[in-house]
């Protein structure tokens, strides 16, 4: 019987059919000599075995097969509760705990990350749709994180994403990654190829969740394919306040000097180049830098857009610049939204103008003409979801919610990173 828990450094771990593309790609990067955090991959068979032990297989089938929507929601809730509340079977828990103990014995804190079999694939990246758990302090927290990652396959957000991509959660499974925590001083993401043929790097101080969730406007560095730094734009950070309903929801402060020096930027550029060669296509990466240097955390396929030629009628109108998602051109009526509770105001064909571009906004990508956000960067999770759907998006646009009138006609160039509106 194949091992359920395999070190990422072993050849066996590069099998996406067992460990998911996220874990398999990470294993391939490390085995090719690129710096990664190391760790273990947990076979999706562990999830399937747990499901069978809990008697949840028929319940799983009912989520998408039931025509009764309340019953389908009940099935989904039963899946989440069953996976969260019931203990992990001992024969599954023991090899995972062995990996956890090895991490703790090294003096590091542990991390549990999702690696679903449908995740990080062309056309279904699932960016920000599942869960990762950091800084796990004891075995109880570790096993809770394992159960929560399994249950995340049945979250409302993940199920909504699957429904719009023609996927059924009952037909897939959740593999896992168990890793030591990278104590990030700086973290971010990168695109190995833009529509202009360049490489793009985002960076911010501290762990990468703020960039992924679109909560900061990160540093932006653009390199040509020879590795020459063409652009360097410092980021901005905001301090969040509660839902403001029309008032400014965030106060702004400048982040100061840039997060990476020229040598570190060049190093990341070379890492992205090698990752692209290994994956066989342009990639989007996530990375973190601790006291020992830069480590790659993830590499997923990247959809690259084509340069757009704007209609000349728009060139005479006011413009704002920001970080392009890298794909698309669209026009529509601006709908300025100050918090997620106002999303019901966004109608099909509107351009959503907001402050924070978090992955929870993924639900509107099915029907909007574009997205403009004051925070976020080209490597945020929502930008990744927008690229996947071909929705133009511009992030890190200062004062967009104040400058762009609600109801005005807006043009969004997701390749050039330009937003224009008619007065």
What are these regions, as identified by a protein language model?
Residues 203-284, 289-290:
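Conserved catalytic alpha/beta cores of large enzymes that bind or transform nucleotide phosphates
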Residues 42-59, 225, 241-242, 277-316, ...:
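Terminal amphipathic helices with adjacent charged low-complexity linkers/tails
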Residues 7, 28, 111-113, 125, ...:
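Structured core elements
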Residues 57, 211, 301-306, 329-346, ...:
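Acidic, glycine-rich flexible loop/linker segments
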């Amino acid at each position: 019987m194949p091992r359920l828990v395999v070190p990422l450094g072993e050849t066996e771990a590069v099998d996406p059919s067992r460990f998911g593309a996220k874990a398999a790609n990470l294993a391939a990067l490390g085995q090719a000599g690129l710096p990664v955090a190391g760790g273990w991959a947990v076979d999706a068979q562990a999830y399937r075995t747990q499901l069978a032990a809990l008697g949840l297989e028929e319940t799983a089938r009912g989520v998408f097969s039931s025509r009764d929507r309340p019953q389908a929601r009940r099935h989904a809730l039963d899946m989440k509760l069953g996976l969260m509340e019931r203990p992990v079977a001992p024969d599954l828990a023991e090899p995972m705990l062995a990996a956890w103990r090895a991490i703790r014995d090294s003096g590091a804190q542990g991390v549990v990350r999702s690696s679903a079999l449908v995740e990080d694939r062309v056309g279904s990246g699932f960016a920000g749709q599942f869960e990762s758990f950091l800084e796990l302090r004891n075995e109880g927290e570790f096993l809770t994180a394992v159960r929560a990652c399994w249950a995340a396959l049945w979250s409302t957000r993940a199920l909504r994403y699957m429904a719009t991509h023609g996927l059924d959660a009952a037909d897939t499974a959740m593999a896992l990654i168990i890793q030591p925590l990278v104590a990030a001083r700086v973290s971010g993401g990168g695109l190995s190829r833009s529509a202009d043929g360049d490489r793009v790097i985002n960076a911010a101080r501290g762990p990468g969740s703020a960039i992924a969730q679109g909560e900061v406007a990160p540093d932006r560095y653009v390199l040509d394919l020879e590795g020459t730094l063409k652009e360097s734009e410092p980021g901005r950070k905001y301090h969040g306040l509660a839902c403001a309903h029309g008032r400014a929801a965030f106060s702004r402060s400048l982040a100061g000097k840039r997060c990476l020096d020229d040598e570190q930027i060049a190093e990341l550029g070379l890492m992205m180049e090698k990752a692209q060669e290994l994956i066989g296509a342009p990639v989007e990466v996530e990375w973190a830098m601790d006291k020992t240097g830069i480590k790659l955390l993830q590499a997923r396929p990247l959809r690259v857009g084509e340069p757009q030629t704007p209609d000349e009628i728009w060139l005479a109108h006011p413009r704002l610049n920001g970080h392009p998602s890298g794909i698309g051109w669209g026009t529509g009526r601006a709908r300025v939204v100050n918090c997620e509770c106002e999303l019901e105001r966004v109608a099909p064909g509107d351009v959503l103008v907001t402050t924070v571009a978090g992955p929870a906004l993924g639900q509107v990508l099915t029907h909007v003409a574009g997205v403009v956000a004051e925070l976020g960067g080209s490597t945020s999770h929502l930008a990744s979801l927008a690229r996947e759907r071909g929705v133009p998006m511009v992030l890190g646009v200062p004062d967009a919610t104040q400058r762009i009138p609600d109801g005005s006609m807006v043009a969004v160039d997701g390749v050039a990173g330009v937003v224009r509106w008619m007065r």
